[in-house]
Regions:
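Helix-helix packing/entry segments at the starts of transmembrane helices
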Residues: 11, 38-41, 78, 82, ...
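Hydrophobic transmembrane alpha-helices of multi-pass small-molecule transport proteins
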Residues: 50, 71, 123-142, 197, ...
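Juxtamembrane helix-entry segments on the extracytoplasmic side of multipass membrane proteins
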Residues: 3-8, 32-36, 40, 62-68, ...
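Specific transmembrane alpha-helical segments of multi-pass solute transporters/efflux pumps
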Residues: 17, 21-22, 51-101, 137, ...
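Hydrophobic/aromatic residues within transmembrane alpha-helices
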Residues: 28, 38, 42, 88, ...
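C-terminal transmembrane-helix exit sites in multi-pass transporters
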Residues: 49, 53-59, 104-129, 133, ...
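Glycine-/small-residue-enriched transmembrane alpha-helix faces in small-molecule transporters
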Residues: 1-41, 148-175, 195, 199, ...
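Transmembrane alpha-helices of multi-pass small-molecule transport proteins
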Residues: 30-80, 107, 165-172, 186-205, ...
């Protein structure tokens, strides 16, 4: 099977997990575990899982020159990104958060322009403006209070920060993904994430009544650790070996659709006019940013028939 197709399938799988996670993780906060405590649970669980399966893979030495990039990638991907996402989700709603994270491909493009010196077209500038307009609409005009969403504007703002950090993570980790085995990277990045999150999260983590948790909380925590953290990061890293960060970012299109369907079915959120407008602005912006120029598309088609 074509490696690129498998990479796109992996990116789709990771995005589908993230889409479900907006509602699944939302339900357990703060009733069973605080936002910071959940982050520590994620990185601890993923560390154990990656080191566990690491025994079945050949050991790989990491070059000393790459540790700086690994540290930065871990900081943005396993600490800042997770803290902002979980805290933002605890304050906002599943649909709001899923719409805002679709800014990721726009942010990845901006970072690519800065670090890779890529050219940016007027169409992409318009797309960036539309995307941020959608995010600002949610931040400024979202309802000020909803059940289990005590501070929606602040939560939405934190989700924008999350999208930025995840974009930085994708750009920073791409060269590493091409050089090292996926398990090798995850084995070292998640323990770094544990050390970074420990001072912030240990208090809430220790307050959890682990023996008294109902099944409703246990399976949701298990989903967040096993699927949202272990499998999602594994799938994204696999995809990065074959496709650029901007391509993976495009798959965040699907997160709002998946989140809206699941949240509506479970009664955890509902769509309204403001959210619809914001979604249209964000989708329109991301589409303009990520759409290939006609010249490139025509060249690709011509190459297919040669």
């Amino acid at each position: 099977m074509d490696k690129r197709f498998l990479a796109l399938l992996a990116a789709f799988g990771a995005t589908s997990i993230y889409g479900l996670n907006h509602t699944i993780a939302k339900v357990i906060m703060p009733f069973y575990i605080g936002a910071n405590g959940l982050v520590l649970l994620r990185v601890l669980g993923a560390t154990l899982l990656f080191w566990g399966i690491g025994y079945f893979f050949p050991k790989e030495k990491v070059d000393r020159s790459d540790w700086g990039r690994i540290f930065i990638a871990a900081a943005f991907g396993m600490c800042f990104n997770m803290q902002l996402f979980i805290k933002g989700l605890s304050l906002s709603t599943p649909i709001n958060s899923s719409v805002i994270v679709t800014l990721t491909p726009v942010i990845v493009l901006i970072l690519s322009v800065i670090f890779l010196k890529e050219l940016i077209t007027p169409k992409k500038i318009i797309g960036i403006a539309l995307g941020f307009a959608g995010a600002i609409t949610l931040i400024l005009y979202g309802n000020s209070f909803t059940f289990n969403a005590p501070n929606i504007p602040l939560g939405n703002a934190l989700m924008v920060g999350n999208a930025f950090c995840f974009g930085v993570y994708l750009v920073m980790v791409k060269p590493l993904a091409l050089k090292y085995n996926t398990i090798t990277l995850m084995k070292w990045m998640f323990p770094l994430g544990v050390l970074m999150n420990l001072p912030i999260s240990i208090s809430e983590f220790s307050e959890v009544d682990w023996m008294g948790l109902p099944w409703e909380a246990v399976w949701r925590m298990g989903f967040v650790v096993l699927f949202t953290t272990f499998f999602a990061y594994l799938l994204n890293m696999f995809a990065l070996k074959e496709v650029p960060p901007t391509t993976i970012g495009v798959f965040t299109y699907l997160q709002p659709l998946i989140a809206i369907i699941y949240a509506s079915i479970t009664g955890n959120d509902q769509m309204d006019g403001i959210k619809t407008l914001a979604a249209i602005l964000v989708f329109g912006g991301v589409y303009l940013v990520t759409r290939k120029p006609k010249k490139v598309m025509s060249k690709e088609k011509k190459h297919q028939f040669q």
